[in-house]
Amino acid sequence: MEALYQSTNFLLQKVQHDLGRLEGTQNEQDAQVVVQCIYGDVITLKENCQTLDNYVSREPPARRQAARMRVDQLRADVHRVDMAVSAVHTRMTQRWRAATERDELLRTRYRPNDTALSIGDHELLLNDRLQSSHTHLDDLISQGSAVLENLKSQHLNLRGVGRKMHEIGQALGLSNSTLQVIDRRVREDWILFVIGCIVCCIFMYAFYRFWRG
């Protein structure tokens, strides 16, 4: 189990490094090669986490709790990286699409009634600004979705950790006051999670209203 855990952790670091490479690519063709490699590694990471879950159930009771917490943390890290990869890929795809549409627009000439009519510099500049606004709005929505998913994942992890701390506390004979402190901390984390979601939604709504004028 330890060997698989270490190799999975190493693969996770490789995916994070490849994610930086993806953001630095200069064209869509090079980026697609990196994207395919990253998605293949993410699939392997998820399969390894599933295998580690099976190994944890076979661990001796004295080591099972600690092993479960390590695997759960690794799974949460894999989930966050997966969400980051999806957000970056979506943002870059939108950027490539906007660049392609802009290039096509620059090469296009409209011919109503067989009369050639080219787009003036002012119209081209206005279109570029509109495309840029759409791209920035899409980026913000993607980042907001990633933040909400990250907050949700952290909340689930905190609930799992709180439950496991209860089990460990009962196994070790911790006092009720100690368990109450743990419960209070979990409730405070839940309140922070809800506040973070509300603030994120308000910010996205305010930006949308501002952008719509």
UniProtKB/Swiss-Prot annotation:
Bilayer disposition of the protein: Single-pass type IV membrane protein
GO molecular function, one term: SNARE binding
One Pfam family hit: V-SNARE_C
CC terms in the record's Gene Ontology section: endoplasmic reticulum membrane; ER to Golgi transport vesicle membrane; Golgi apparatus; Golgi membrane; late endosome membrane; SNARE complex
Keywords: Endoplasmic reticulum, Golgi apparatus, Membrane, Protein transport, Transmembrane, Transmembrane helix, Transport
Residues on Vesicular side: 211-213
Swiss-Prot/TrEMBL GO biological process terms: protein transport; vesicle fusion
Primary location group: Golgi
Subcellular location: Golgi apparatus, cis-Golgi network membrane; Golgi apparatus membrane; Endoplasmic reticulum membrane
Membrane topology, Cytoplasmic segments: 1-189
CDD domains on file: SNARE_GS27 (cd15863)
Stretches that traverse the bilayer: 190-210
Protein family according to the UniProt entry: Belongs to the GOSR2 family.
Cited function: Involved in transport of proteins from the cis/medial-Golgi to the trans-Golgi network.
Assembly description: Part of a unique SNARE complex.
Name of the protein in question: Golgi SNAP receptor complex member 2 homolog memb-1
Source organism of this protein record: Caenorhabditis elegans
Taxonomy of the source species: Eukaryota, Metazoa, Ecdysozoa, Nematoda, Chromadorea
